[in-house]
Regions:
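Sec/Tat signal peptide C-region and signal peptidase I cleavage site
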Residues: 26-30
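Non-membrane alpha-helical segments in proteins
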Residues: 51, 85-97, 111, 127-138
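Tetratricopeptide repeat
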Residues: 63, 67-70, 105, 112, ...
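N-terminal secretory signal peptides that target proteins for export/translocation
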Residues: 1-11
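Repeat-mediated protein-protein interaction surfaces in helical alpha-solenoids
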Residues: 62-76, 110-114, 274-286
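Bacterial N-terminal signal peptides
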Residues: 14-24
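Short, charge-rich amphipathic alpha-helical segments embedded
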Residues: 79-86, 114-125, 329
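Charge-biased low-complexity segments
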Residues: 31-43, 51-52, 56-60, 81, ...
Length: 414
C-alpha cells in the first residue's frame, strides 16, 4: 500500500481500486524508504558467541559442583558478609569463562545484591557488576533484563543530567544506543519512541550548547537523535480520513497501536510532521560548529537523499567525492550514520542471509539474490530489503554509476 499526500487529498492505491481520501491539512508523508537496520540490517559477525574453553558436559559438572559449594558457603557467611559477595562474583566470572551466561547472570545478580546491602543503593562501585550483567543479558537474549540493567546504570549515573563528565555521557550514549536497538528488534511501541526522542533531544541540545563538551560529544548525541528520528519517520504514517475505517480519523501505519485512543500516538504524529525541520536544525548546528567536518556533511547529504532532496544531495555528494573518492566507490545502504545495527539475539525471530543485488543511480535495488534458498522468511527479507535506499556509487570522474552490492544481512521478524 502507498499513500500519496497533498494538503487537500490523498490517493490510496489498493489492488486495482483507487480510493480518494480527504487528508488532514498540513501532514507530510512518512518516509517511503526503510532505514537499513529496521527489519533487515547488516549482520555483525562480532555477535558470534565464543566457544567455551571446555566441552559442555565438563563445564556442566564444574558448575554444578561450584553451585553446591556456593550455596553452602553463602549460608555460612550470611547475606551481609562482603566475603559472600566476592564468592558470587568469582563464581560468575568462572561461569562466563565456561560459556554459561544464564548462570553467570544469576550469580552476578547475587553479588550485586550483596554489594548494595553493604554499600548502599547509590554506590557507584556497583557499576562494574552492572556492566557484566548488561553483557550477560545481551548474551542470553534477555530483552527485559537488558533494559532493566541499562536503565539502572543510567539512573546510577544521574540520568544524563549535568554536571557532565566522560562517564556520565558515555553511559547516556550507551543507554540511547541500547534503547534504539530494543525498539527496532521488537514490535514498535509509540510511548517508548516518544520518550526516547525527548530524552535524546534533551541530551543533544544540552551537549551541543555546552562549549566544554560540544567538540567531543555533540556529534555522538546528534547521531543518536537522528537515529530515533529515522525510526519514528518510518513507522509513523500521516493521519487521514478514511470512509472505510472504523473511525472518521484513521491512520495507515506500520505498527499496531490504537491511535485514536492513545494521546501519546497523537503527540508522535505531531512530532513526525516536524521531523524534517528538526533535522535541518541539527545540520545547522553542525555547519556553525563543525564547518570543516566532511563526515557530518555526508550524513546531512544522506538524509536529504533519502528524503527526496535529490538535487542538493547530488551536489553535496559530488563535492565530497572530489575530496573523498573512497566514500563513493560502492553503494552504501542508508543510514550509514547513525547506524541502526540490530542484534539478532534480541529478536524473537531472526535469520542471516547473504544478499547480492544491483544498485542503480537513484539508489534503488534490483536483481536481488538472497541465500540460502528456501530459508525461513526469505520473501519478507527480500521485500524489506527492496525498500532500503542506497547512496549510489560514483566513478572516478564523479558520475553516477550502477554498481553491485553484496553483504551478510540479518532479517528480524516479530
Amino acid at each position: 500500500m502507498r499513500t500519496c499526500c497533498c494538503p487537500f487529498f490523498s490517493v490510496r492505491l489498493q489492488g486495482l481500486g483507487v480510493i480518494l481520501l480527504t487528508c488532514w491539512i498540513g501532514t507530510v508523508k512518512a518516509s517511503e524508504h526503510r532505514p537499513f537496520g529496521i527489519g533487515v540490517g547488516l549482520y555483525q559477525h562480532r555477535l558470534t558467541v565464543e566457544q567455551a574453553s571446555v566441552d559442555a558436559r565438563e563445564a556442566s559438572l564444574v558448575l554444578e559442583a561450584l553451585d553446591v559449594e556456593l550455596q553452602a558457603r553463602s549460608s555460612e557467611l550470611g547475606p551481609y558478609d562482603p566475603a559472600a559477595g566476592e564468592l558470587w562474583l568469582s563464581a560468575a566470572e568462572q561461569a562466563v569463562s565456561l560459556g554459561d551466561y544464564q548462570l553467570a547472570e544469576q550469580w552476578f545478580s547475587a553479588a550485586l545484591h550483596n554489594l548494595r546491602l553493604n554499600e548502599g543503593l547509590q554506590s557507584t562501585s556497583q557499576l562494574s557488576i552492572v556492566e557484566k550483567l548488561v553483557t550477560a543479558a545481551r548474551r542470553n537474549g534477555d530483552r527485559a533484563e537488558l533494559a532493566n540493567r541499562v536503565d539502572y546504570r543510567f539512573r546510577l549515573l544521574g540520568l544524563g543530567n549535568p554536571p557532565y563528565d566522560e562517564t556520565i555521557l558515555a553511559a547516556a550514549d550507551d543507554w540511547l544506543a541500547v534503547k534504539i536497538e530494543l525498539l527496532i528488534t521488537d514490535t514498535f511501541d509509540s510511548r517508548t519512541a516518544y520518550e526516547l526522542y525527548n530524552r535524546a533531544d534533551t541530551l543533544q541540545s544540552a551537549v551541543c550548547d555546552d562549549p566544554v563538551w560540544r567538540a567531543s560529544w555533540c556529534r555522538t548525541f546528534s547521531f543518536r537523535l537522528l537515529g530515533v528520528m529515522s525510526v519514528i519517520d518510518w513507522f509513523v504514517q500521516p493521519l487521514v480520513k478514511d470512509e472505510f475505517a472504523d473511525s472518521p480519523l484513521s491512520t495507515f501505519k506500520r505498527h499496531d497501536s490504537v491511535w485514536d485512543n492513545n494521546p501519546i500516538d497523537h503527540k508522535l504524529q505531531t512530532l513526525n510532521r516536524t521531523i524534517e525541520g528538526r533535522a535541518r536544525r541539527i545540520f545547522e548546528i553542525w555547519r556553525n560548529h563543525f564547518p570543516a567536518d566532511d563526515q557530518l556533511r555526508l550524513v546531512a547529504a544522506d538524509w536529504g537523499w533519502v528524503h527526496g532532496r535529490r538535487a542538493q544531495a547530488l551536489s553535496d555528494y559530488r563535492e565530497l567525492q572530489s575530496r573523498h573518492p573512497e566514500w563513493f566507490f560502492r553503494p552504501v545502504a542508508l543510514p550509514q550514520q547513525p547506524a541502526l545495527t540490530p542484534d539478532p539475539r534480541l529478536a524473537r525471530n531472526s535469520e542471516v542471509y547473504t544478499v547480492r543485488c544491483q544498485v542503480n543511480t537513484w539508489g534503488r535495488v534490483s536483481e536481488i539474490e538472497l541465500s540460502p534458498e528456501g530459508a525461513t522468511g526469505l520473501a519478507v527479507a527480500r521485500r524489506q530489503f527492496r525498500e532500503v535506499k542506497f547512496r549510489p556509487a560514483f566513478d572516478a570522474s564523479g558520475e553516477l554509476v550502477e554498481a553491485a552490492f553484496e553483504a551478510d544481512i540479518v532479517g528480524i521478524r516479530d
